[in-house]
Every structure is written in structure tokens, then in C-alpha cells.
């Protein structure tokens, strides 16, 4: 999972609840350390207890063995992070955008950016009105 905000943390949490080993990448090393030691994301979701199979990191190369990567990066930083992650992603890795919005220059969708950087990879999108509060509680969205 790329992006340790509320949406990225909730999606990583849901994957961990389903038994997956999850690496949650974020730029903030202190927050990554807090998640690993206290099992909470105090900046965004202080009431959500995270599982032991969810590990946070600020080292982007830690994604190198991932079968699938979900991008939960703000749209204004999406391309920069996608380019930074590119050397650590194999052509077999499934890539999914869970980022809202479009790129400010050119109005590109995030999936278009991924297909430009990773033309051989399978690419998907998670979209729709998914309030973090519903998703965090594993409730169906309305």
C-alpha cells in the first residue's frame, strides 16, 4: 500500500483483516515507527487498532516483493511517487489506484499515469463514494 493517510491506512487494515501480509509505505518515518510499535495511525485514525500483519515503512524499496500495490497518494503527488516506486515493481505486479481526482496538468486519471509508467502491468481502480468511517468499520458503503 502506498500512502499512509486515512484511506490508505483503512485499505491496508482491511487487507490485513483478510489475512494478507501488508506493507504500508508513507513518507513520514516517525508515523511509520508509531504504527509499528503502537499499532495505530495517530495522525489520521487514532481509534483504529491495526493488526500485526500490517507493517509500516518509509523505505519505498520495501514494496519490491509485493504481488499487488494499491496507490492511495494525493493526486498532486501521484506521478512523483509512482516514478519513485517504479524501479521496485515487477511487470507481474497488480497495480491499483485508489486515488481520487485527476492530475492538474493534463487532466490525466491516475490509472492513465500508472499505464504510462508501467505499460505491461495489470492496472485497476477502486472508486466511488467510500466514507472512511464506513470502510474502517467494515460496513458496506451506501
Model regions and ranges:
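A short, hydrophobic C-terminal helix/tail in secreted or cell-surface proteins
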Residues: 138-142
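Short, conserved active-site loop motifs that form the nucleotide-linked donor/cofactor pocket
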Residues: 53-55
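Rossmann-like NAD(P)(H) cofactor-binding subdomain of soluble oxidoreductases
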Residues: 50, 61-64, 68-137
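NAD(P)+-binding Rossmann beta1-loop-alpha1 motif at the extreme N-terminus of oxidoreductases
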Residues: 1-48, 58
Amino acid at each position: 500500500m502506498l500512502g499512509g493517510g486515512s484511506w490508505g491506512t483503512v485499505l491496508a487494515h482491511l487487507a490485513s483483516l483478510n489475512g494478507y501480509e501488508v506493507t504500508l509505505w508513507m513518507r513520514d518515518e516517525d508515523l511509520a515507527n508509531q504504527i509499528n510499535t503502537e499499532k495505530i495511525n495517530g495522525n489520521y485514525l487514532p481509534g483504529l487498532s491495526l493488526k500485526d500483519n500490517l507493517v509500516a515503512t518509509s523505505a519505498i524499496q520495501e514494496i519490491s516483493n509485493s504481488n499487488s500495490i494499491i496507490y492511495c497518494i494525493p493526486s498532486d503527488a501521484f506521478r512523483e511517487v509512482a516514478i519513485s516506486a517504479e524501479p521496485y515493481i515487477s511487470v507481474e505486479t497488480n497495480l491499483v489506484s485508489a486515488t481520487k481526482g485527476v492530475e492538474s496538468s493534463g487532466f490525466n486519471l491516475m490509472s492513465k499515469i500508472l499505464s504510462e509508467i508501467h505499460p505491461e502491468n495489470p492496472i485497476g481502480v477502486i472508486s466511488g463514494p467510500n466514507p472512511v468511517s464506513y470502510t474502517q468499520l467494515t460496513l458496506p458503503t451506501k
